[in-house]
Amino acid sequence: RTLSLLCGQLRIPKKELWCIVAGKPIRFGLNEFHHITGLNIDDLPTEKFEPEADYKAFFSELRVPTGEGPNLDELRQGLVTCRAWPTEKRRWFGLLTLLSIGLFGLHTNSRIPFESAKRVFDDEAMKTYPWGRAAYEALVVSIKLLRPIGKTYTVGGLVFVLQAWAYESIITIAERFGNAVNADEIPLLRWGGSRTRSTIESVIAEDIKANGGE
């Protein structure tokens, strides 16, 4: 279902998505991302940030190239030695892994943005950084570069937001395939997963026919 939405995109220059569903456009932008996730979408800071903690030594221990954030392969290698680390270093390691897998949804050789990775080493910076905007921009870039091959495709980023967006935006999809596990949660946590081979076009066509349309 999500692929049907992504393949129906309008070509626009802005950092947002517009998709055609049943002949009508629906929008996926920064505000929609915030509504679904509840994450901070303030502007990304432009000033240089340097944490007091010696992050360079930590990255060097993980064999991360100078001036870059770690990738998942490097973090996996760190699993071998992290058990012997002090609590603070294990916490840094865990947060970096969370960013790589949970927030940015990176492939194994893709790196956490350097400016984002450095925030892990400062508690206040970690709490106040606009993770929502950073995650949204990474997701949109990945989607705009999408080139499906056959019936397969790979999208990086916080992709579960797209499923929640489809359920929140298209009532027919939510009614047919949505599994609302907690109506009081934010949309990202409200819907359980499901799989189907139906396309959005076929579902909407069936709905129109069932309601007396043509």
Task: State each model region's role.
Residues R1-E214:
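Structural stabilizers in ordered domains
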